[in-house]
Regions:
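Pocket-flanking alpha-helical
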Residues: 73-104, 119-121, 126, 146-149, ...
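Periplasmic-binding protein-like
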Residues: 111-121, 145-154, 209-274
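A conserved helix-loop-strand patch within extracytoplasmic ligand-binding domains
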Residues: 110-160, 259
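Short helix-initiation/N-cap motifs at beta->coil->alpha
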Residues: 68-78, 165-193
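Beta->alpha turn/N-cap motifs
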Residues: 45, 69-73, 83, 88-97, ...
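Ligand-binding "clamshell"
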Residues: 98-110, 124-125, 197, 202, ...
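Extracytoplasmic "Venus flytrap"
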Residues: 36-55, 71-75
């Protein structure tokens, strides 16, 4: 990843780790005082299988988890802000920060889940070196994931970003493009399905799998895991961080049964982040 990113990533990682450590000081109770049901917003697909296991783990502590499935990245936060769900689990900190800035949400992270390294995929090329001059490369068009995609392209030498452009870099921050690649901005859910119309595409793992892409054979590059700021987490409305059910929910996710479920559902591409 870009050398300029290391400091900000480390600071972000430490800040989040500290916040979650503080939340974790109170051990999750063996059972809740009364049976309680919580609604958790997730994005449909492989994560539905993972959350079935989370629900089983939560039930052991008296917490009933009902998932509410959405089909894009905007709805889960809208629903959480309105109170239509009690928590959600689908996003990383750069995405939430941008949503708070642009939409004024009152949402906070409470526990890490997993990280899905974003990858560069192609049906036409077998390596980055095979990409021709003028190659058309698709990237997600939402601010946080576009910056993430551009950093991947920089990490493999396809472009260079302006120093200090950070994790919210845009195409306007490209200062060198030796192969004259053409960046095509598409909705995160569309970019993977457009792979046959592109030379390559940077696709989030969940959307890659939904689009029929195979990380083992179609992925020609991926972002590093070290100091990765894109760890996903469970989030709740501000003011509920220390509710007993929140601690129970986080504990229900952060265990070996869910590690196994992640490995099975995502074929090793979903890496536990706690």
């Amino acid at each position: 990843m870009a050398r300029a990113m290391c400091g900000r990533r480390s600071i972000l990682g430490l800040a989040l780790a500290s916040a979650f450590a503080f939340i974790g000081l109170a051990v999750a109770p063996a059972s809740l005082a009364a049976a309680e049901t919580v609604r958790v917003g997730i994005v449909g697909g492989e994560d539905e299988d993972v959350w079935k296991v989370v629900a089983q783990q939560a039930a052991k502590s008296g917490l009933t988890v009902k998932t509410v499935v959405f089909n894009d990245y905007t709805q889960p936060n809208e629903a959480l802000e309105r109170g239509d769900v009690d928590a959600n689990a689908f996003q990383h900190k750069p995405y939430l920060d941008n949503q708070i800035k642009t939409r004024g949400y009152h949402i906070v992270p409470v526990g890490f889940t997993a990280v899905w390294p974003i990858g560069l995929y192609s049906h036409k090329r077998h390596s980055v070196a095979d990409l021709p001059k003028g190659a058309i490369i698709g990237v997600p068009n939402d601010p946080s994931n576009e910056g993430r995609a551009l950093i991947v392209l920089q990490s493999v030498g396809l472009i260079k970003l302006r120093d200090g452009s950070g994790i919210l870099a845009t195409t306007a921050d490209i200062v060198a493009n030796p192969k004259d690649v053409k960046i095509k901005e598409l909705d995160a859910g569309v970019v993977g399905r457009s792979i046959d119309d592109l030379d390559a595409a940077v696709v989030n793992t969940d959307w890659a799998l939904k689009s029929g892409l195979k990380p083992d054979t179609d992925r020609i590059a991926q972002e590093p895991l070290a100091d990765n700021p894109y760890r996903n987490f469970i989030a709740v409305k501000a003011g509920h961080e220390n509710d007993a059910w929140v601690k129970t929910l986080v504990a229900a996710y952060q265990n070996d049964a869910v590690k196994d479920a992640l490995a099975k559902a995502y074929h090793g591409t979903g890496v536990p982040a706690w």
